[in-house]
């Protein structure tokens, strides 16, 4: 009997070029032989030169997307990407916690998207606080780049190998553990 294909959810922004965000996640999920599902957390007008506009749908719509999907589809893992506001982050965290308690999405990968590839800032200070306080406690894995790691830790970006190791250890301390051991 063939193995069931795991359903994997991306909660992220839409990059019309397909080079990042929800569309890129879905391509990655397909390449990894999983079935990708997507919840739109933001819409962007961007290209390789920069972000021109960001539209954040109402959190009620985000909640409706999440609840409708989780009520019907068994999600093995969730990856978050661009969550463009504190309200979006808090709603995402609240719904993930709710559905995890129902046995859904035991694995949560948080990509703390804070800066576009063009260098444009995507999160304000309040949203970063919500990310650290509400979403990171649910994370199984986080995938910050060096500038994002610096923001999460409130320090300058690590440059040396030793600084990177210290930053990785500090980031690991932000994640929950089952028994207190890694």
Predicted regions and their residues:
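Short, conserved glycine- and acidic-residue-centered signature motifs
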Residues: 18-22, 55-58, 124, 128
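Conserved N-terminal subdomain of the carbohydrate kinase-like
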Residues: 2-10, 28-118, 122
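Short, glycine-rich nucleotide/cofactor-binding loops
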Residues: 12-18
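Conserved phosphate/ATP/ADP-binding segment of small-molecule kinases
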Residues: 125-182
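Hydrophobic/aromatic ligand-binding patch that stacks against planar heteroaromatic rings
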Residues: 27-28, 171
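Loop/helix-junction capping segments adjacent to catalytic residues or to phosphate/diphosphate-binding pockets
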Residues: 19, 86, 161
């Amino acid at each position: 009997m063939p193995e069931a294909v795991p359903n994997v959810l991306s909660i992220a922004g839409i990059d019309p070029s397909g080079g990042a965000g929800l569309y890129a996640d879905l391509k990655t999920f397909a390449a990894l032989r999983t079935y990708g599902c997507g919840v739109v957390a933001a819409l962007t007008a961007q290209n390789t030169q920069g972000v021109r506009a960001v539209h954040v749908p109402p959190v009620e719509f985000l909640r409706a997307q999440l609840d409708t999907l989780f009520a019907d589809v068994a999600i093995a893992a969730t990856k978050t990407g661009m969550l463009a506001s504190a309200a979006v982050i808090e709603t995402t965290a609240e719904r993930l916690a709710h559905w995890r308690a129902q046995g859904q999405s035991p694995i949560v990968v948080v990509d703390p998207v804070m800066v576009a590839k063009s260098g444009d800032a995507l999160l304000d200070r309040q949203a970063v606080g919500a990310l650290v306080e509400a979403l990171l406690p649910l994370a199984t894995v986080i995938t910050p780049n060096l500038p994002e790691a610096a923001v999460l830790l409130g320090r300058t970006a690590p440059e040396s190998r030793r600084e990177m190791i210290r930053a990785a250890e500090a980031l690991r301390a932000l994640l929950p553990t089952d028994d207190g051991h890694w």
